[in-house]
Amino acid sequence: MQQGDTIFSNPDVRTILLTETNDTTLKKEGFQITTVGNLTKVSGRDGSGVIYGCRELIDRVSSSKGKLNLPEKLTDGPEMVLRGACVGLQKMTYLPGHGVYEYPYTPESFPWFYDKEQWIKYLDMLVANRMNSLYL
């Protein structure tokens, strides 16, 4: 922790501080997690970095099996600028009178495309896997 950070003295209370930083050693969308005592600080190079740092903590809590061991210092950041998935919106046949694969994206032709709950789960999965783009 840097000088000036508040260190909380109650050992029964863990505090997580989220912050954006101007640390140019972090990659774009990168983050650093530092733990001193009961204070854990998640610093992101930008807002996405803070979110990815939080996802790292969520992953560690989920896999801790009752014994939480937060890193004293962990720095991470993406190697690729664009990371994402491609969802193909096409059918296997042409529409009558058309010589190319073109379709209106209507609930009748692509009902799954309009399923809000499914999209929320899918987008959550993209964030959990540190993806930042979706190609349709």
Q: How would you label these PLM feature ranges?
A:
Residues 24-30, 35-136:
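Feature activates predominantly on carbohydrate-active enzymes
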